[in-house]
Regions:
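Short alpha-helical DNA-recognition segment
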Residues: 22-41
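Key DNA-contacting residues within the recognition helix of helix-turn-helix
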Residues: 15, 40-41, 50, 69
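Alpha-helical residues within the helix-turn-helix
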Residues: 19, 30, 59
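Residue-level detection of the helix-turn-helix DNA-binding "recognition helix"
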Residues: 19, 33, 44-46, 73
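A short, Lys/Arg-rich alpha-helix, primarily the initiator
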Residues: 1-20
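Short, charged recognition helix plus adjacent turn
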Residues: 4, 69-78
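DNA major-groove recognition helix of helix-turn-helix/homeodomain DNA-binding modules
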Residues: 52-67
Length: 78
C-alpha cells in the first residue's frame, strides 16, 4: 500500500484571493485576525496558518477546508 503525500495549497489560494479582491496583506490579515506579516509568511510558504484558522479561511476564500490539500501519489480510495 502506497501512502499518499499531501501538499498544502493554501498559499496560492490566499494570494489569488487577495489579488482578485485588491486586498493588501494588512486588510486580509484584518479579516482573519492576524498580522500582515503572518499572511505574508503564509503566502511565501514560510509557515502555515494554525489549523484553527482553516474553517474561517475556507469561508473567506469560498472553498472547503479539503480544498487546501492536494493528494499526490498513493491511492486516495484506499
Amino acid at each position: 500500500m502506497t501512502m499518499p503525500t499531501y501538499h498544502i495549497t493554501i498559499a496560492e489560494k490566499i494570494k489569488v484571493y487577495r489579488n482578485e479582491n485588491n486586498l493588501s496583506l494588512k486588510e486580509f490579515g484584518k479579516l482573519i485576525g492576524v498580522s500582515a506579516q503572518a499572511v505574508c509568511k503564509w503566502e511565501q510558504n514560510i509557515c502555515y496558518p494554525d489549523i484553527i484558522f482553516l474553517p474561517h479561511l475556507a469561508r473567506i476564500l469560498n472553498c472547503t477546508t479539503d480544498d487546501f490539500f492536494e493528494i499526490h501519489g498513493g491511492d486516495a480510495n484506499e
